[in-house]
Amino acid sequence: MKKFLFSLFLILFVQSSFGEILEVYTWKPFPGRSEQLLQTFQEAAAIHSKLGIGVTINALGVGTSQNMDYVLRYDDLESYGRLKDANFYDEEWNTFLAKARANPSGELVSSWSANNIDPLNMADDFTEEGQVIAFFRWQPAPGAVGLQTMIQGASESKPIHESLGARIETYQINSGENRGQVL
């Protein structure tokens, strides 16, 4: 039992410390302003990309009111800190942010962050133009055993989906809405 708990702790520590980091911001466009929100996202993405931050824009089509996700990706904790600082002090970003805040086209409805279970995955793996991305959130049973069982199940199903041509990544939400869920 001690070996199992130590292994579980080690797995959770490694994934939280070294894996790719996502920040997901879900926005709801104001009525009639979906196009403007998308244009705002594209302008923000151009600035973030210049700074070296991976960006994905997802229109949520099921169960939402035209909500959109703006996703920032970082390779690891070091690049997260370095790029967040660069973004904070970037003149182009701050000018853009002031303009977007003066005439918003939507409202932020949620935000959260997650770590990739695979510490070797890099943020730029998701920056290919035209990629189709889908997220599925799973709530593990309470406790460390529930989380480990969920991660094991995701790992076991991965080869099945990949044999059908899909690319599968598993993340654990570590802050914000639905903390502890697995993607």
Name each model-derived stretch:
Residues 18-183:
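Short S/T/G/P-rich N-terminal loop/turn motif that feeds into the first structured element of a domain
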Residues 3-16:
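Sec-dependent N-terminal signal peptides
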Residues 2-3, 101:
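Basic side chains
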